[in-house]
Swiss-Prot record:
Endonuclease that catalyzes the cleavage of RNA on the 3' side of pyrimidine nucleotides. Acts on single-stranded and double-stranded RNA. It comes from the Eukaryota. The lineage of its organism: Eukaryota, Metazoa, Chordata, Craniata, Vertebrata. It is found in: Secreted. Belongs to the pancreatic ribonuclease family. It is an enzyme of class 4 (lyase). CDD domains: RNase_A_canonical. GO terms for molecular function: lyase activity; nucleic acid binding; ribonuclease A activity. This is Ribonuclease pancreatic gamma-type. The keyword Signal applies.
Length: 147
C-alpha cells in the first residue's frame, strides 16, 4: 500500500511540474541570441504591417507579460543580413561601449510604441513601418577551442 501511495504522489508531482515549469517563461531559459531573435526578428512578417501588428507581436513574443514593454523594433530581413552587420561600420553604443555596428544599407523595420493611455494588462501599441539603418551590439569574438 505504501508503494502505491508513493507512486501516486510521484505521478502527481510530475503532473504539477509539467504545468508549472512552462509557466516559468521561455525568457529564463534563452540565450542572448535567442532573446534578440524573439524580441527583434520577424523575417516572415508582412511589410507594411497591419495596424494591429504590434499588439499581436508584442503579446505573442512575451513582451507584455507582467508589464508593457514601452517600445520595440522588429526587423523584417533574413537573420543572416542582420548578423552581417557585425562586420560593417563600427560605432559607439548608447552606453558608451564600442561593440556596436551600423548597417550599411536601410532595412525594413516596424517600430512599436506603447500608447500613452495604455496600461497593463491591456497593452496597446502604435505600429510604424519604415526603412532605416539599424545599430546592433555585437559580442566579442570568443575562441572556444583549438584542434
Amino acid at each position: 500500500m505504501g508503494l502505491e501511495k508513493s507512486f501516486l504522489l510521484f505521478s502527481l508531482l510530475v503532473l504539477v511540474l509539467g504545468w508549472v515549469q512552462p509557466s516559468l517563461g521561455v525568457e529564463s531559459r534563452e540565450t542572448q541570441t535567442q532573446k534578440f531573435q524573439r524580441q527583434h526578428m520577424d523575417e516572415e512578417g508582412h511589410f507594411p504591417s497591419s495596424p494591429t501588428y504590434c499588439n499581436q507581436m508584442m503579446k505573442s513574443r512575451g513582451m507584455t507579460s507582467g508589464s508593457c514593454k514601452p517600445m520595440n523594433t522588429f526587423v523584417h530581413e533574413p537573420l543572416e543580413t542582420v548578423q552581417a552587420i557585425c562586420s560593417q561600420g563600427q560605432v559607439t553604443c548608447k552606453n558608451g561601449k564600442r561593440n556596436c555596428h551600423k548597417s550599411s544599407s536601410t532595412l525594413r523595420i516596424t517600430d512599436c510604441r506603447l500608447k500613452g493611455s495604455s496600461k497593463y494588462p491591456k497593452c496597446d501599441y502604435t505600429t510604424t513601418d519604415s526603412q532605416k539603418h539599424i545599430i546592433i551590439a555585437c559580442d566579442v569574438v570568443h575562441l572556444d577551442a583549438t584542434v
